[in-house]
UniProtKB/Swiss-Prot annotation:
Protein name: Transcription termination factor 1a, mitochondrial
Chain positions of site Interaction with DNA: R144, R184, R332
Protein encoded by which gene: Mterf1a
Region (Interaction with DNA): 151-152, 229-233, 306-313, 337-340, 366-373
Species the sequence originates in: Mus musculus (Mouse)
Record InterPro entries: MTERF, MTERF_sf
Main location: mitochondrion
Transit peptide: 1-37
An annotated GO BP: regulation of DNA-templated transcription
Phylogenetic lineage: Eukaryota, Metazoa, Chordata, Craniata, Vertebrata
Function: Transcription termination factor. Binds to a 28 bp region within the tRNA(Leu(uur)) gene at a position immediately adjacent to and downstream of the 16S rRNA gene; this region comprises a tridecamer sequence critical for directing accurate termination. Binds DNA along the major grove and promotes DNA bending and partial unwinding. Promotes base flipping. Transcription termination activity appears to be polarized with highest specificity for transcripts initiated on the light strand.
Length: 379
């Protein structure tokens, strides 16, 4: 009897459980059906809202004078951001003295600027002002290189870089030059800047410099861009100078602390290619290996000239009956453009000045000095 009662209880429980499950499943099914249109409606509203925001963004940017096509090419992802701060950025830059035209140009070339918050911008600006003398100086840098300021919003990294560069003995004047000429230095990771400074210190010591910090200051002051290059590139260029000109440690040290510092950040391929062209061109004009090396060492800026520019200038001078030996003795004349060279050669010829037998140094003089000389020649 007890067994029968237990069986009845179990059967009733199972039937009740089945009824409850059927009822619950139906409710879930009906709820899922009833919620689907609502969910689709929400998605549609969100999409419409996002599209409206993007239309609003485009409208704002056009009003601000932004070149939309340029901005899309450079950083298209910015236009998909749900939140942007273009109006806040405009007000911030206006308060610092930037014109509407400059602001439009900045955003056109670096659209990501509109994703920075006012708080981050203000903090970063204050850090830059510790180096620069005025807001206008910073605005000028942003106009030339907006990426340098807006590329990173890691203000702690910027602050640490400033402290580190001060700690290695860079003067306020040197920091100002860095921020003006190579602002990306301050967006580098702190470790990257440390690696380059340590490399330069070790290089100075290996060449016999008794003050590694002073060596670093000299190199950076002469070539502010060096900190945004790789240690491999700088090392390869130093090795190139040493092997090409057969320099001992003392002479190499003097060279890279002086005029050689400027070419340390050049592309290694560019350095070798340009030097090879200079050498081959001058040898073809009858110059000796010694004359070629003396010519380049006396004015290392020659290495910056591309193959075409160098050859065109040499051809221009040779056509005007100026000898290779005269060019070797006056390398700075190659700083002048071809148009300047041709104009001055023509004017001097009309004034009765014989460049084939007289000094050609005046071809590289400043315009003011040259005009004074020409006036005297013309009587």
């Amino acid at each position: 009897m007890a067994s029968r009662n237990i069986w009845c209880v179990r059967r009733n429980f199972l039937f009740d459980l089945r009824d409850w499950m059927l009822q619950y499943s139906a409710e879930v099914f009906l709820k899922s059906i009833s919620f689907r249109p609502f969910s689709a409606e929400c998605d549609s509203k969100d999409k419409e809202s996002l599209e409206e925001e993007r239309e609003d963004l485009l409208s704002n940017l056009v009003t601000m004078g932004v070149d939309i096509d340029m901005a899309r090419r450079r950083q298209p992802g910015v236009f998909n951001k749900a939140v942007t701060n273009e109006q806040e950025l405009k007000l911030f830059l206006l308060s610092k003295g930037a014109s509407d035209k400059v602001i439009g140009s900045i955003i056109s070339r670096y659209p990501r600027a509109i994703t920075r918050t006012p708080e981050s911008l203000s903090k970063r600006w204050d850090l830059w002002r510790k180096i620069m003398a005025s807001d206008l100086e910073i605005v000028n840098i942003l106009e030339r290189s907006p990426e340098s300021f807006f590329r990173s919003n890691n203000n702690l990294n910027l602050e640490n870089n400033i402290k580190f560069l001060c700690s290695v003995g860079l003067t306020h004047k040197c920091l100002c030059r860095l921020l003006t000429n190579a602002p990306r230095t301050f967006s580098n990771s702190l470790n990257l800047n440390k690696q380059m400074v340590e490399f330069l210190q070790e290089t100075g010591m290996s060449l016999g410099h008794n003050d590694p910090r002073d060596f670093v200051r000299k190199i950076i002051s002469k070539n502010p861009s060096i900190l945004i290059q790789s240690t491999k590139r700088v090392k390869t260029n130093i090795e190139f100078l040493q092997s090409t000109f057969n320099l001992n440690k003392r002479d190499l040290l003097l060279l890279i602390c002086g005029p050689g510092a400027r070419i340390l950040d050049l592309s290694n391929d560019c350095t070798k290619k340009n030097y090879t062209n200079i050498r081959e061109r001058l040898l073809s004009l009858g110059c000796s290996e010694e004359e070629v090396q003396r010519f380049v060492l006396s004015y290392l800026n020659m290495v910056f000239l591309s193959e075409k520019k160098f050859n065109d200038k040499i051809d221009c001078l040779i056509e005007e009956k100026i000898s290779a030996s005269q060019i070797i003795e006056n390398p700075r004349i190659l700083d002048s453009s071809i148009n300047t060279l041709k104009t001055r050669i023509r004017e001097l010829s009309h004034a009765g000045y014989d460049l084939s037998t007289s000094s050609i140094a005046l071809l590289s003089w400043s315009q003011r000095r040259y005009e004074a000389k020409l006036k005297r020649l013309c009587g």
